[in-house]
Amino acid sequence: MGRAGAAAVIPGLALLWAVGLGSAAPSPPRLRLSFQELQAWHGLQTFSLERTCCYQALLVDEERGRLFVGAENHVASLNLDNISKRAKKLAWPAPVEWREECNWAGKDIGTECMNFVKLLHAYNRTHLLACGTGAFHPTCAFVEVGHRAEEPVLRLDPGRIEDGKGKSPYDPRHRAASVLVGEELYSGVAADLMGRDFTIFRSLGQRPSLRTEPHDSRWLNEPKFVKVFWIPESENPDDDKIYFFFRETAVEAAPALGRLSVSRVGQICRNDVGGQRSLVNKWTTFLKARLVCSVPGVEGDTHFDQLQDVFLLSSRDHRTPLLYAVFSTSSSIFQGSAVCVYSMNDVRRAFLGPFAHKEGPMHQWVSYQGRVPYPRPGMCPSKTFGTFSSTKDFPDDVIQFARNHPLMYNSVLPTGGRPLFLQVGANYTFTQIAADRVAAADGHYDVLFIGTDVGTVLKVISVPKGSRPSAEGLLLEELHVFEDSAAVTSMQISSKRHQLYVASRSAVAQIALHRCAAHGRVCTECCLARDPYCAWDGVACTRFQPSAKRRFRRQDVRNGDPSTLCSGDSSRPALLEHKVFGVEGSSAFLECEPRSLQARVEWTFQRAGVTAHTQVLAEERTERTARGLLLRRLRRRDSGVYLCAAVEQGFTQPLRRLSLHVLSATQAERLARAEEAAPAAPPGPKLWYRDFLQLVEPGGGGSANSLRMCRPQPALQSLPLESRRKGRNRRTHAPEPRAERGPRSATHW
């Protein structure tokens, strides 16, 4: 079946290579912010209702300034600027008799027999279309939201409640995928209570209701619908198509490989009205193709088969948007997630290619070599591509061919032939994606926000890779937006307000698209961040405004090289030298933690009286940690100046300058006895050895920011580091009470 076709049949050849890829460490973010940090310093807002879960449907209304949320038994209307203020809620529970029927059918009365709102669409200027599971009795209603933003309204229209079959799923565990075009709703759902009859369904509007052929695995084979989009094909609205993204069990897989899940993109024509004698009230223009997201390897491709979400990023030409999709693996051996990018031209090219064909049960899937009837199956009836005005006018051989050949032979491959961004061996899986196109000083960049199943959002930027047209994804931030680490179930973005709205089972969160101040206080840190939202303005790292005519806007997203942009910058303060003291034979910890998790830390050492700097190498007595340098069994010759520097993007940035003074045990004891004997003194200048005495005295409260150390303890020298650290904190008896006294002047010494 060719490269793409073979991939469709055997998606898991490269097991050995996949295991090797799986052993690789996941890419770290440049900046990691906890829930507490986001809430305290970066404006994270959250919203939740009491005794309510499952916030799955999000709808951004920029005109009214509202975020509409569908949840268990509720629809909520939130303020787009701050979702925790001016919230309105509408209770919409399932009727008692429906809940009882649901319970009698064997469903859980507390977790399944509720009305889980799955769909929210803007129906007209005053109403929303909302659909929910209705305790396994799908139902839809029109919700009045008013005309103006100044007076938000949220009211259920009791006279416009209708059956939701074919619009909303029965089961709350099933995802809802739909799009409202005009007054027509296109949905991918299970149309029966048992969840076996999956269909692509059109309802509402003036055109007849249509569905896919039921119980035909060639059309749909246990699909899981993900997203639906309406994308124009030309200036003629008769050519408009609806694209469905889903995953299903592959019918083209070899029986020896078992049940294999693949990702698909399907298409239907919006003006399809079904066939005249065959495929009556069924789609006559339905086609599907495999959506491939894989990493090429020597032994074969490693596939990410589980499509999780798709985001359509509009371009100047509304016919050619970019499609950003997130995938995960289905293998229990190799686990990872990936982002692949697709162009609509490649999708259309696959649907204009050869059809997949199989002669019989014992035959292989091949490219169809016979005559394809006219008009070509999958083409819309319009004046653009033919003379047919309706699908009911299509010849019988066209309808019959469309019924038997819904699958295309060629797959849709990602731009660049490989994922834009992937994470292997991470403790999370990608679940959702949203994208924003940002104008920067050196061009336009796509910024991706990727939700995970552990309540985090990854901020990734797509940057050009060398001179080739392909791009690579750089992980800028990891944001913990949910305190309970609940999986991200939905995301919506407001480019106008620069806000991201994230939903989970437990809450809805709101976070800004940028946190420029978090990147650093100096020019180099701001430029190294490569955040297209941010630039150095000569004083601080602030929001970049493309229209601002400011002279000192420094930004380099493509290369992240501050050597030129920040060469004349005087914002970085002089690197002060901090005195640190240690006792011979004990341990000392020199703390130095770079702001960026992607930076490599280098330590150099300058011995007293020597001008040359030598690199501190890893050996038995030295251990590098994420927070600094640990020196064990200190010697007098360890005294000197230690310089900590961060290396990132080939740029070296000094961070700390620490002067270590190693004292003998005799000197330490003498200083301690002098401290005991010296009388109290009025407040005055603090001596250089006060910090040292606070460190060596038991319970002295030494600062962790400069040094962690202990007196020599021979009995503990052979123990592991953690044991020695615990030993320093143990006490076998209560400390003797000591009188409080203030610092003394140097005259007592």
Swiss-Prot record:
Q: What is its main location?
A: secreted
Name the PANTHER family for this protein. SEMAPHORIN, SEMAPHORIN-3B
**Could you tell me which SMART domains the record lists for this protein?**
IG, PSI, Sema
Q: Which GO terms describe its molecular function?
A: chemorepellent activity; neuropilin binding; semaphorin receptor binding
Q: In which tissues is it expressed?
A: Expressed abundantly but differentially in a variety of neural and nonneural tissues.
Which BP terms from GO are recorded? axon guidance; cell-cell signaling; chemorepulsion of axon; negative chemotaxis; neural crest cell migration; positive regulation of cell migration; semaphorin-plexin signaling pathway
Which Cys-Cys disulphide bridges does the record give? 102-113, 131-140, 269-380, 293-340, 516-534, 644-710
What range(s) does the Sema domain occupy?
A: 30-513
Record's protein name: Semaphorin-3B
* Signal peptide positions (record): 1-24
- What are the annotated GO cellular component locations? collagen-containing extracellular matrix; endoplasmic reticulum; extracellular region; plasma membrane
